[in-house]
Structures are given as structure tokens and as C-alpha cells.
Amino acid sequence: MLVRGLLSAVATIFCGAPKDTDLRESVAVGIDLGTTYSCISVYSPSSKDTRFVLSPGGEETYPSVVYFKKLPEGDGKKSKYEAVAGWPGLQMYNAEGNANTYFYAFKRGMGIEDLANIDKKVEEIKRNASVPIFVESVGGKKRVAYKIQEAMQDGYESVTPEELSSHVLRMLKDQIVKDYKIQGLTITVPAYFDVNQVAATIKAAEMAGFPTPIIWKEPSAAAFAHTYDLIRKGITTKEEVDDMNICVFDLGGGTFDVSIVESSGGFMMVPSYGGNNFLGGENVNDNLTKYFADYIKSSTGFDVMENQNVKLRLRNVVEDMKRDLCDEVRKSPGRKANPSISKSFIYDGEKSIVLELTNEKFNELNADFYSRIRKTMDSLLSGDGKDNKGYDKSLINRVLLVGGSTRIPKVIDIVEEIFGANKIYSEGVNADTIVARGAALYTANSLNLLNESEQIVTADSVPLSLGICTEEDHFEAIISKGALLPATGTKEFTTAQDNQTKVRIRVAQGGLESFKDNIYIGDIELDLPGNQPRGVPRIAVTLEIDTHGKIYVKAVDLQNNKEASSYFSSVVANMTSEEIERFEERVHGEENQELVKKREVVRKLEQAISQAESPKFAEVIPENIKKDALEYVQKTRLWLEKHKEIAPRIHIEEKLQEFDNGMKEFLSSAKSGEEKEIGREEL
């Protein structure tokens, strides 16, 4: 049996608080934390619409880069460097030109710090990205890091991907709080981000000083923003949106993410998605940089790749050429033009060379890039023979192109070849900002700020809370409703009886107070040594649920490392949105809420009785009344055991007040004010 332990209550009284003179509006915030660029959108409750938080220069996006400025010697600071993120960081790099203290594309290194195969994962990153990453050991634990150093021969400081992301997020936060108060926050991640990558994103946000954010999937955010606009502009209704299946094709600077988003019954679901953590515009930049570096070496003998500063300058130049070329081709009829873009590049002192790029050469250099896009799409639509069963593309109503790299003409051609040009919807869709806008709307949705006709429930999150049975029939949630899939959660418990030899972990999904009223999943048993008093064992229970509804349950005795585990299937994964909605109505219904309140009163009375039964309380009761006091406590316990399930809440509240008054009489001459001991929940 699982039973809650004694929890101390802390009361804080605020007196004479000053009047709030902060006139900034409280807003719902959405952040698209991108590999190359990030964007901030806020939903204003007063205007009932979103707006973007612009940079000081008026841009809607911010470079996801960090430049470490060297501090003056002898200033007493722990670090020799100061982090400068976003546009100021990029401008400082352009002015000072030190590539060894300039960092970009670090999103690809997020969330691999705690992996057992960390060395193998880092090698994969090195193969797929031109970012100087390595593994170091800190306190006996391996972690991913980058080197900050003035020159290759100097000593270095290290910085983690999470720390770099936190610098970007802190810069974004500074921009937000200039004009707004943060009422709630959503940060988007690729649909295929795993639990570790999600946790790393949350960690970076908290390091930046944000409240713990909601984490949401980028394709869902884009689809939400799109359907919201259709409803708001009167182009369609919420009911008509229910028949809409959207393919979100999100090709950004560092990641490729493609998802099918279905709407049904007011729910937004992601039944199928795919992606590649190492495919995006940065790969195109890599290909162009290598091509022109080889050209410069063969023409002049100068090796650009041996000089990090020159290499990074070349990379910036070819990125500009890429954009100019793609703009020219997109403007041409049928995107069939083969323009030529030329730029002069200074590579060695004052020496310069003219670089030229045609669309034909551009596509030739990126043939493998296009092939990998097609392969991902084929896997998504045709299936991979494993968990992904494929998706009938004829069911897709429209395709949204999201991310800056969808401006590459050949990428547009590929999408049109797959779905047909008539299904690509671009009117009013800003590929750079739609994800952030959707994130802000989702935050507003979670805060109940949207009109009823605009609200959408997403089902790419846990639809009903997942938990275990405690206190004989209490449902204790371990993974809460709304958690991003895949999701995991762990809570620690202890035993309810002396010399307990095993504990049974019963798992259900729902959220109703009474465990038996929820949807039963399964159970496991964990063996214990059996020679320990109640409250001594430490038992960690972990629940995990993946995007396909598979549930993993594990219980570990932390004192001897014994464990039990098993896999189950979620019945909820096969429920219709209407069935889930009806269950949610029961969770928020009057009957369940009354039971929650009643159980809380029962819990308080149980805690008071347990406290009165403890040796500490027996010691302070005078001998002449000790027998009467202990009999009174025992009588109250017997009453509670008999009536806690059948008596109404008001009767238990009366008994709690009666017991409290009775104990005060017994202890009126004894010492008082002993603090309750905080304990773990009990198994």
C-alpha cells in the first residue's frame, strides 16, 4: 500500500505590500529557440492578438549565436570572458573577428550530457556539423562542451550547449521584460526531440531566469498559428478545421522536422512525424564553404580551412551568396532561371579573389542534401517497416513551409513534386516567425486567454495524467496531463508497514481522485529486505510514456539497488478525442472535486493522529493523563478507519476539529511548538 507521509505546512503572511506601480502588460510569451535564429512572440490579453518583440535594430528574429568578449585582466571575476548573445554578439564578432570565441549551431549538442554513449554521440555531431565540440570530465561525470580560447595555443575555458542556449534565452528575456511582464511561457522544440533534449531546453530556460516553460513541438505551433488565423479571419470555422490535415514541412538552419497535424473534435494531434537533427541550412553552408575553400586553395595555394577566422568569414560570405541566389531564382518564372552571383573575398591580408556561384552549381553541390530530404519524406509517408506505418498523402489538405531553408527553390520543387503545387499554402505564412507566434498562442490557450472558438487542445501531449495508487485508493499523478510526449516522471516513496517484504505498484491513467475510477494500466511488484521499520526504505518509481502510447514502469529500492520493471500499453492512446473529453469532464466535475477535498481532510486527520501516536508526543504528556490521551487517540483512529470512506466531508472536518481541541486540552500543560518532521510518501 502507498501512503503519503507527514508533510509540514508553511504559512507565509504578507502584510502592507506596496502598491504595484509596474504598468507593463502581462502577456503570454512564445519563443522559437532555433538553431540559427530565434524569435519572440507575445499574446496581449488587451488587444486579443499577437505581436513580435523586435530587436533594438527592428528585426523580428535574433541570431542564435554567442560571442565571448575578453574581460580586462585583474578584475577579480571567475571567467576571463563575458557572453554577448544575439545581434550584439554577431556585431562584436564581425568587428573583432575572433572565431575561437564565437559559437553557433549549438542546439545540435543539447541533451546528450547524461547519455551512456556520450562519446559516440559526440562523434556523430562532429561528422554532421562543423561545430568544434568535445567531451570533458567534471567531478567524475562526462559532459559535452565547447572551448573558449583567444588563440589555439592559449589555455581555454569550457562552455556547455545548455549554457550557450541560456545566454541566448537570457538575451531574449531582457528584450521581453523591457515592455512586458511574463504571465506564461512556451518554448518550441523539434517534434523528434527526446526526453533528455527537452530537459536540457528547460534547464537552459531556468538558467536564463525564466519561469519553468511549457515545451511544445514546432510543427504543432506552426499548425496552431495557421488554423487560428483561418478562424480569426473568418476564412473557416473551428468545425471546418476539424476536417483539416496539415503537413508542416519545417526546414530550418540546423534541423529538419516534418509532421502531419490532424484536427478532430477540437483536438490537434500529430499521428506521424519524422526529421533529422543534422539537416538544415547549415549543411548547405558547409557544402558551399568547402567548395570555395577548395577553389581558393587550388587558385592561390592559400588553405582557408587552416585559419578559423578566415574560414568563418568565408562561411558568412557564402551564406549571403546563398540567400541572394535563392531570391533571384524564386523571382524567375517557374523558378527555372540560372543566375550567377559574384562576390569579392579577402582571404590573406589584402589579397582577394572573386567567387562566383550559379544555381546549377548550387544544386549540384547540394545533391546529397536534397536526397536526404526526400529520404525523410519517403520514410514518413511510406513507412519505415517498424513503428511508423506511413501516411496516405492524399489525405493531406495543405502543406505549410516553415523555416528559412524552405526558401531554397529546389526544396520548394521537391515539396511540389510530392504533394502538388496546389496544396502548398503560403498566403500570410511567414516561415521565420510562424512557430513563435503559434507558441505564444499556445501559452494563451493554456492560460484560457483565447475565445472559445479559437481554443484547440493538442494531443501530442499526454492526454490524461499517468500515476500510481497510494493510500489504498488515492491516485498519485507522476506524469501530468499536458506533458510533452515522450514524457517521464519519477517520485520517491517509502513503506507503510514494518518489515514489509514487497510493494505492489499499481498504474493507471486518468486523474480522478479515486484510483479505482481511473483507467487501469497494470502493476509490478518489488521485493524488499523485509527487516526495516516503516518509513525507512527509499523507493523511486519512474513512469515513461512514448509517442506510441507504450508505458514503461520501473521501481527501484535505492538502498540496495534492487529493481522491478515492465512495459504496458496505454488504453488512452486508442481512445477517441470525445472519450478523452468526457473523462476530463469527470476529472473537473463536482463529484470528483468533492472527493479531492474530502481526501485532503482525511489526510490531515491521519497526519494529526500519526503525530499524536509518535514517541515525541507521548514524552510530553503528563503521566496522570497519558492513559486517557492514548485511548482518545486510539478511539479517533478506529473512528476514522470505519468512517473515512462512508462519512461526508463535513463529518470528518468536525472530527478533525474535535480531535484538535481534545489534543490541545491534553497538552495544555505540556511543551508545545514541536515541528512536524517532513517525510517521504509511504509505500
Swiss-Prot record:
Primary location group: cytoplasm
A Gene Ontology molecular function term of the record: ATP binding
Subcellular location: Cytoplasm
GO cellular component, one term: cytoplasm
Keywords of this entry: ATP-binding, Cytoplasm, Nucleotide-binding, Protein biosynthesis, Stress response
One Pfam short name: HSP70
Ranges in a coiled coil: none
Lineage top rank: taxon: Eukaryota
UniProt keyword Zinc-finger, yes or no: no
Example GO biological process: translation
InterPro entries in alphabetical order: ATPase_NBD, Heat_shock_70_CS, HSP70_peptide-bd_sf, Hsp_70_fam
Record bears the keyword Chaperone: no
Similarity-based family: Belongs to the heat shock protein 70 family.
Protein name in the entry: Heat shock protein ECU02_0100
Organism listed in the record: Encephalitozoon cuniculi (strain GB-M1)
